[in-house]
C-alpha cells in the first residue's frame, strides 16, 4: 500500500482510504470473528479486543447486497477500538510513504432497516443513553468516530447518509470535521440531496451514480453490459 501511495503521489493522484462502517462491513466482521475464535482459548479479553459483532444479536435485516450479517454492532466498545486501531495504522502508512493524508472516508451508507433491533447490547445501551430509536444509535457512532479522527488531526469523509436527518445542533458540531460528503444517490426526487447536504453546512462532492459509477450500463438494454439499479 505504501508503494501504491508513492506511485500515485508521483502522478498527482490522491488516494483516499475508506473504512466501511458501520454497514458494508462483512469482511471486517468475519475477520474479527476469526480472530476471536483463534484467541478465545488463550485470552478472552484479547479475543474480544476488536470484536465487531454480538453473538446474541438476532436482528433481521437484508442489505442492498443481500447480506444479513454485514453491520457492525455500534454498542460494542470494541468497535471503537477497531476504528481507532485501523485509523492509526492508516495514518502511519501515509507517514511512512511521505504522502499527506487528506481524509479518511468512513462509509456510513446503506445501513438497512432492522439493524440493531435484535441486539440486547444495543437495547441496553439505548436505554442507558435515553435514545428513542436506532437512528440515534447511528448518530452516536458518527459523533464518536468523527471526534476521534478530528483529535488525530484527520478530516472525515462519508457517503451522503452521514449528513442526512440530523438535528441542526448535531450538524453544527460535526460538519466542520468533514472534508466532504459524497452525494451518490441523486436520481429523480433525490436530486435535492446535494443541496440539502450543502445547506446543512457540509462540503459536497458530487459522485452521481448514473454518471460516475463505472459498473453501470450506459442504458438498460438487455444486451448492454453493466448494472442498471
Roles of regions detected by a PLM:
Residues 1-152:
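Substrate-binding cleft of carbohydrate-active enzyme catalytic domains
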Residues 77-84, 88-104, 124-229:
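Substrate-binding groove of N-acetylhexosamine-processing glycoside hydrolases
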Amino acid at each position: 500500500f505504501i508503494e501504491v501511495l508513492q506511485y500515485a503521489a508521483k502522478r498527482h493522484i490522491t488516494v483516499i482510504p475508506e473504512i466501511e462502517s458501520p454497514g458494508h462491513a462483512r469482511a471486517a466482521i468475519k475477520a474479527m470473528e476469526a480472530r476471536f475464535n483463534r484467541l478465545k482459548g488463550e485470552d478472552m479479553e484479547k479475543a474480544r479486543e476488536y470484536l465487531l459483532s454480538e453473538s446474541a444479536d438476532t436482528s433481521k435485516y437484508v442489505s442492498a447486497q443481500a447480506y444479513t450479517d454485514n453491520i457492525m454492532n455500534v454498542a460494542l466498545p470494541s468497535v471503537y477500538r477497531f476504528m481507532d486501531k485501523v485509523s492509526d495504522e492508516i495514518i502511519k502508512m501515509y507517514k511512512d510513504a511521505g504522502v499527506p493524508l487528506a481524509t479518511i472516508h468512513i462509509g456510513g451508507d446503506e445501513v438497512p432497516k432492522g439493524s440493531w433491533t435484535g441486539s440486547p447490547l444495543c437495547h441496553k445501551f439505548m436505554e442507558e443513553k435515553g435514545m428513542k430509536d436506532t437512528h440515534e444509535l447511528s448518530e452516536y457512532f458518527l459523533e464518536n468516530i468523527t471526534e476521534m479522527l478530528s483529535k488525530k488531526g484527520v478530516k472525515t469523509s462519508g457517503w451522503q447518509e452521514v449528513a442526512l436527518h440530523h438535528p441542526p445542533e448535531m450538524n453544527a458540531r460535526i460538519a466542520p470535521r468533514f472534508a466532504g460528503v459524497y452525494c451518490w444517490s441523486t436520481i429523480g426526487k433525490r436530486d435535492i440531496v446535494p443541496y440539502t447536504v450543502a445547506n446543512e453546512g457540509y462540503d459536497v462532492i458530487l459522485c452521481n451514480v448514473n454518471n460516475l459509477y463505472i459498473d453501470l450500463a450506459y442504458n438498460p438494454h438487455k444486451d448492454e453490459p453493466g448494472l442498471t439499479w
